[in-house]
From Swiss-Prot:
Main location: cytoplasm
UniProt keyword annotations, A-Z: ATP-binding, Cytoplasm, Ligase, Nucleotide-binding, Pantothenate biosynthesis
Name by which UniProt lists this protein: Pantothenate synthetase
Main enzyme class: ligase
Positions with a binding annotation for ATP: 30-37, 147-150, 176, 184-187
Functional pathway: Cofactor biosynthesis; (R)-pantothenate biosynthesis; (R)-pantothenate from (R)-pantoate and beta-alanine: step 1/1
Organism: Chlorobaculum tepidum (strain ATCC 49652 / DSM 12025 / NBRC 103806 / TLS) (Chlorobium tepidum)
Location of the active site: H37
Positions bound to (R)-pantoate: Q61, Q153
Family label: Belongs to the pantothenate synthetase family.
Amino acid sequence: MQIINDPAEMQKIAEKLRLQHQYIGVVMTMGALHEGHLSLVKLAKAHAGTVIMTIFVNPTQFGPNEDFYRYPRPFEQDAALARSAGVDYLFAPSTEAMYPDGYSTSIDPGPIATRFEGASRPGHFGGMVTVVVKLLGITRPHLAVFGEKDAQQLAIIRRVVTDLNIGTTILGAPIVRESDGLATSSRNIYLSSNERQQATVLYRAIRYAKMEIDKDRTDLEAIAGEAEALVRSEPDAEPDYLCFVDDATFEPVTQAVTGKAYRLIMAVRIGSTRLIDNWRFDYQ
């Protein structure tokens, strides 16, 4: 595995790989790698002959009261995990390399970015999608793999890649969960043992909603309210949002219609740690 820090060098390597007819897959991360990230690499390797991983803690997608400086950066450990997972190139630029003096461009992802995570974290999606487009330009991939856990992020990336005719295939990877159902996340390390136990309520809320949908209920707003009450039953759990949305547009929905795809989405603070989770389903 080759480690590269310079965007121009990475771009030259990617262009050379394309000239050699190598099919390139990219996995973008902020480091602090866990099983969820490694599952993205595995999926990328199943589709691409060459896999590039990026590690960049992007300051422009963190809000003023968020955990940019607290965010874990165990680079040596991450590099070892990437190497053992079969990554071919690890691109790890500095903030100065990505945003040099005079940098002024940003992308507005549109209305989908103003709801839910966008409302809770103003500016987050603009910063996220701008760096994604930059990294696509640097790594020149045919395929990019993103996790379904960040479902709104995935929907926005698909929209922007389509709207801007970028030409990269965007592949969503299933959520990887711990044995008790908690979605893997770099932020799980912030949870105390008691909070870690309470955090399983996110998955319990998903299981409850699935059970109610399986009863052919269509009243999604009511089911979401019941699931939120379950979340609030934990003493340190405080939902930012919990509702059903159209899977493509992330517009809130109150009633299920046969033949449509929906997603239950939630963001919940467990103590001081904010966790997200979701569940996608086709209503038949």
